[in-house]
Structure formats: C-alpha cells, structure tokens
C-alpha cells in the first residue's frame, strides 16, 4: 500500500482529480469501521479444508521487509480469536517463516499439513517455493520432517468474496472521487 501511495504522490500533479482507495485489509474494526481482516478470513475460510486433530493448514503469504509485514501477526491473532485451530500464517520473504511455524506443528501433534497461498495469484512462489519438487520447497522441507503434505494451488483472485471486496474498494474510491456522501474518508484525494 505504501508503494501505491508513493506512485499516487509521484503522478498526482498530472491529473485534474485523483483518488487512491484502501487496501484489501486496511481497517481493523475501530471507530465504526469494518474489520477487514475478519472479512478476509471469512472469505478465505470457504477454501479451508476440513481438518482432524492431527491436521494443520499453513497459509503462505509473501512477506516484506516493510513495517506492513507486522500485519501477518494481526491476521494470525484474528484467526486465533475466531476459534480456528491449527491454522498458521507464514511468509516466503518475512516473518514468521516456515521454520518459525514448524515447532508449533510438532508441539500440537500435527502429522498432516495443507499448504495454501494467500496471494492474489498462485504463481511462482506457490508453484515453486511452496509446492515445488526441489529439496528447498516448503512441501519438501515439511516432508523431510515427517509430515504428510497436501497443496492447494489457487490464488485469492479465484475467490469470489475477495474479488467482491476489491470491487467494493474500487467503488468506494470512485465515490470519494465524485465527492459522494458516505464515501470512505480515508481515501487519498487530490484536486487541482
């Protein structure tokens, strides 16, 4: 989101009017706003497999060195608050890593793991880093530690509720651009 805001600021003088909408997970339920993280979890929960006591779901996120990486802790906390058991968020390029999550799996007696990307597209990271045949893929690492591993190779863009959330944000941004009443007040808007 900080990148989008930087691009917005770079080009704002080239347009008569411009607005920037909010990201998929922006609000956290404060000040009468929606809880986007809870709505996100509800949306992706339609993809969660049924799990027994010795099964876990690992949600693979991208990760970043930016401060926004802390949002993955918020997602994990909300998953826990919502009562989901043995669902863990980890990242390819940030914290928590797969290595951070594996001790939790062992502690909880997990034997079977499903890996699922929480990325818009199940692309290179999902097919290679997560589910690849190389010894350093997440699937191979988990298998080498004795876990049975399934993979779910679908991106968030395939989820109708996620697509609807993006359409809603685009409509909110349009309403803010048009100065419509009730438009989300946190949109960045610039008018000449």
What is the predicted function of each stretch?
Residues 1-114, 119-192:
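Extended amphipathic ligand-handling, pore-lining, and cofactor/metal-binding catalytic surfaces
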């Amino acid at each position: 989101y900080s990148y989008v805001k930087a691009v917005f600021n770079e080009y704002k003088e080239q347009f008569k009017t411009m607005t920037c909408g909010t990201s998929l997970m922006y609000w956290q339920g404060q000040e009468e706003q929606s809880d986007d993280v809870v709505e996100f979890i509800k949306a992706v929960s339609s993809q969660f497999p049924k799990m027994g006591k010795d099964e876990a779901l690992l949600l693979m996120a991208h990760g970043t060195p930016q401060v926004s990486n802390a949002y993955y802790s918020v997602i994990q906390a909300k998953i826990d608050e919502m009562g989901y058991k043995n669902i863990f968020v980890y990242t390819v390029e940030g914290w928590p890593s797969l290595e951070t999550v594996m001790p939790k799996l062992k502690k909880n007696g997990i034997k079977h793991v499903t890996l699922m990307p929480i990325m818009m597209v199940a692309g290179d990271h999902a097919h290679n880093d997560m589910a690849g045949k190389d010894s350093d893929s997440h699937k191979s690492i988990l298998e080498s530690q004795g876990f049975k591993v399934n993979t779910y190779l679908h991106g968030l863009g395939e989820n109708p509720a996620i697509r609807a959330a993006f359409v809603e944000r685009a409509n909110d941004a349009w309403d803010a651009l048009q100065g419509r009443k009730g438009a989300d007040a946190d949109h960045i808007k610039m008018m000449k």
